[in-house]
From Swiss-Prot:
Binds 2 magnesium ions per subunit. The keyword Ribosomal protein does not apply. InterPro entries: Xyl_isomerase-like_sf (IPR036237), Xylose_isom_bac (IPR013452), Xylose_isomerase (IPR001998). Mg(2+) 2 binds at E267, H270, D306, D308. Its cofactor is Mg(2+). Its EC number is 5.3.1.5. The keyword GTP-binding does not apply. It catalyses: alpha-D-xylose = alpha-D-xylulofuranose. GO terms for biological process: D-xylose metabolic process. Homotetramer. It comes from Rhizobium leguminosarum bv. trifolii (strain WSM2304). The active site is at H100, D103. This is Xylose isomerase. Belongs to the xylose isomerase family.
Length: 436
């Protein structure tokens, strides 16, 4: 039943590249077969509950611009928000959604009331999922907005805050499991510091390791079969975040023996903040065996902070999905639109239009990536570039069968005098542009 929030807008349909209808897909066709799989099953789109239905439109210089009828901290408002959200998922045809606990339930006076409120809304969500067919990609806990977390959650100097946060995560894992969520995400929003003058760096990292081990232990205890994901971010809101980027998180997981238990949810905007390209973070996560899922958005390249805009750059999407596909595609992860409207985009239709544009952009990127893989447009030049390593002698070198003395003798007796070869970067950049 319609809530009336979206007026007379009908379910978004595919109309083809020539369509000028802003409420239609031009490239995203859920049932189109790409590399032997439905496009919907490749992309596994999800809507972010927080930016789409909870963000009030404020910025550092001004307050709320969005006037939503559910902007009250009551259970009645939470259920109205859920009604609108699931109507939105159905109109858009999004197979998944994601949420923080604080996005979906009113704030209680204590932990017990928060848990009661969360359980009530989870029961409501279960009914909505059953009636719409929309599924939960992942759940998570908001351990950064409330003032109790101003000095961190797992890394807080107060053990009571650590305990409150750990108990909150338990309830959120329970909620995620009950709703059939395929992943559970940990984002260390305030797991970092502003100054070393009041920070015991080693202690905080050890606390974070203990916290993550507790989560993994609980996952196995209750038989939760989803994937635990960490989302890296270099700064914001703290100056120095402990989960800076893929490489940093991998080192942390390795130190605590969790590299086979936890994978990463990689956000495009966070990669940019860390000084990396999106495809760098995806390729590195694949190389390290910890790729899990994507938060899809983009940052303004001039602003220098996290702007969470909808993706609109097809070449960037093509390279991103190239690495997703090259790594075997999503397993339990997907493409979550961690994107928000600009604060002047007030119309309900703008929510749909932003997601439609993002989904079309991703669809174009996916199809370009698939063609590049099928044509070996990048993989063959890569194989040719490293072909020398396929020789018998080079394989022995790679496997560690030669000592430094033996390698030196080989170079001398064979009079090895290598000459550089072109890296062909311009050619490969032109190849990518041919596909997009």
């Amino acid at each position: 039943m319609s809530t009336g929030f979206f007026g007379d807008i009908q379910k978004v349909k595919y109309e083809g590249p020539d369509s000028t209808n802003p409420l239609a897909f031009r490239y995203y066709q859920p049932d189109e077969i790409v590399m032997g799989k439905r496009m919907e099953d490749h992309l596994r789109f999800a809507v972010a509950y927080w930016h789409t239905f909870t963000w009030p439109g404020g910025d550092p210089f001004g307050g709320q611009t969005f006037l939503r009828p559910w902007f009250e901290d009551t259970m009645k408002a939470a259920k109205l928000k859920a009604d609108v959200a699931f109507e939105f998922f159905s109109l858009l045809g999004s197979p998944y959604y994601c949420f923080h606990d604080a996005d979906v339930r009113p704030e209680g006076k204590n932990f017990a009331e928060n848990t009661k409120n969360l359980n009530e809304i989870v029961d409501y969500f279960a009914e909505k999922q059953a009636s719409t067919g929309t599924k939960l990609l992942w759940g998570t806990a908001n351990l950064f907005s409330n003032r109790r977390y101003m000095s961190g959650a797992a890394t807080n100097p107060d053990p009571d805050v650590f305990a409150f946060a750990a108990a909150t995560v338990k309830t959120c894992i329970d909620a995620t499991q009950k709703l059939g969520g395929e992943n559970y995400v940990l984002w260390g929003g305030r797991e970092g510091y502003e100054t070393l003058l009041n920070t015991d760096l080693k202690r905080e990292l050890d606390q974070l390791g203990r916290f993550l081990n507790l989560v993994v232990e609980y996952k196995h205890k209750i038989g939760y079969t989803g994937t635990i994901l960490i989302e890296p971010k270099p700064q914001e809101p703290t100056k120095h975040q402990y989960d800076y980027d893929v490489a940093t998180v991998y080192g942390f997981l390795k130190k605590h023996g969790l590299e086979n238990e936890v994978k990463l949810n990689i956000e495009q905007g966070h990669a940019i903040l860390a000084g990396h390209s999106f495809e760098h973070e995806l390729a590195l996560a694949n190389a390290l065996g910890i790729f899990g899922s994507i938060d899809m958005n983009r940052n303004d390249y001039q602003s220098g902070w996290d702007t969470d805009q909808f993706p609109n750059n097809v070449p960037e999407m093509a390279l991103a999905y190239y690495h997703v596909l090259a790594g075997g595609g999503f397993k339990t992860g997907g493409t979550n639109f961690d994107s928000k409207l600009r604060r002047q985009s007030l119309d309900p239709a703008d929510l749909l239009i932003g997601h439609i544009g993002g989904m079309d952009c991703c669809a174009r990127g996916l199809k370009a990536a698939a063609r590049m893989i099928e044509d070996k447009a990048l993989s063959q030049p890569l194989a040719d570039r490293y072909a020398g390593w396929e020789s018998a002698e080079a394989q022995k070198l790679f496997r560690g069968e030669y000592s430094l003395d033996e390698i030196t003798n080989w170079v001398e007796t064979k009079d090895v005098n290598p000459q550089p070869r072109s890296g062909k970067q311009e050619l490969l950049e032109n190849v990518v542009n041919r596909y997009v």
